[in-house]
Design a protein with these regions (language model features):
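N-terminal amphipathic/basic-hydrophobic helices that include classical n-h-c signal peptides
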Residues: 1-33
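Acidic/glycine-enriched connector segments
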Residues: 21-200
Length: 201
């Protein structure tokens, strides 16, 4: 392929991604307008939850923090105040760390952890456990749904994350598993869903 063709392909990809992101901003403005109407009628502020895969390809993992930054800054600027995550390895961890980072710019926002059980980290590697403890220590609140693991506790955690949320920021590229379950549950509940998978290169 000639250098000119390669350059054109890169330009088209850049324009496509910018179009996707602009569409996302328009969607966020719609959420914000509805939120302002709710505020005027005495309703609550915007609540955002996260769902995403535990295992994420390295190339994707390298892009997620900057993409999350763009999306979450947009939501913060439009009034989002509460961010909920479920404390899992992978996307949940990336999202929680990004919210903690954004608290330096937006000190009024809150990170809330809704955790399936107290022994969630029992079989995790030590590095992941240390990161989990850091997030737990710096979150504004955390709640355990069960004292120890029981069948269905993960799904209950997923439902609790969505219930009461206005928008769900997801990374979902599969049709099965916990993330797909939460994604579908959010759609059925009428929650706005932003799938970061659709915004990646």
């Amino acid at each position: 392929m000639s250098p000119i063709s390669t350059k054109l392909m890169r330009r088209r990809r850049y324009e496509m991604n910018n179009t996707k992101f602009n569409d996302l901003l328009i969607k966020q403005r719609g959420v914000y307008n509805r939120m302002k109407e709710e505020q005027n009628s005495g309703e609550k502020n915007l609540v955002v939850c996260f769902t995403g895969h535990r295992n994420i390809a390295h190339a994707v993992a390298m892009q997620l923090p900057s993409l999350l930054d763009r999306v979450l800054v947009g939501l913060c600027e439009q009034g989002a105040t509460v961010f909920r995550t479920g404390g899992a390895i992978g996307f949940d961890t990336v999202a929680a760390l990004k919210v903690l980072e954004l608290k330096e710019r937006y000190p009024h926002i809150r990170l809330e952890l809704i955790l399936p059980c107290r022994n969630q980290t029992e079989y995790w590697e030590e590095t992941a456990v240390r990161t989990y403890r850091y997030i737990l220590e710096h979150a504004d609140s955390h709640r355990y749904l069960f004292d120890s693991y029981v069948d269905g506790c993960m799904q209950e955690r997923d439902r609790r994350l969505v219930d009461g949320s206005d928008i769900c920021v997801a990374y979902c590229n599969r049709s099965r598993g916990g993330t797909a379950y939460t994604f579908a549950y959010a759609l059925r509940a009428g929650v706005e869903v932003i799938n970061l998978h659709d915004l990646l290169d």
